Amino acid sequence: MQMGRPTLLPCLLLLLVLSTQACFIRNCPEGGKRDVHMIQPTKPCMNCSFGQCVGPRVCCGAGRCEIGSTEADRCEEENEDPVPCKVLGQHCVLNNPGNVNGNCVDGGIGICCVDDTCAIHRRCD
């Protein structure tokens, strides 16, 4: 069976399209296709009146955490920044479904925080 030129060209184009892993305008990552596997940059979480922000409206330090107080309201600004922040301190694990990897709040106050909650943790003393 012989394939004519009019048939060969569309077949080659179809093969080319199917074999490439294209990144179209609607689904490209911000840094381009090669940026997908890069580690996302982080920065230390901002400071609040007596410690460090560990979540929106959550401020921890000096042996305590405050949630929703006027001192912790400044931490809401962290949500406006597109670069995610990381709580300073050693790694800890919470029993929080879907969000278990956290960090101890700096200062050895015995509190471990993940993105949306904090709890007393013996590893953080």
From Swiss-Prot:
Annotated positions of the Glycine amide modification: G31
PROSITE patterns reported for this sequence: NEUROHYPOPHYS_HORM
One GO MF term attached to the UniProt entry: neurohypophyseal hormone activity
Known tissue expression: Expressed by the venom gland.
Gene Ontology cellular-component annotations: extracellular space; secretory granule
Functional description taken from the UniProt entry: Targets vasopressin-oxytocin related receptors.
PANTHER family noted in UniProt: ISOTOCIN, NEUROPHYSIN
Listed name of the protein: Conopressin-conophysin, isoform 1
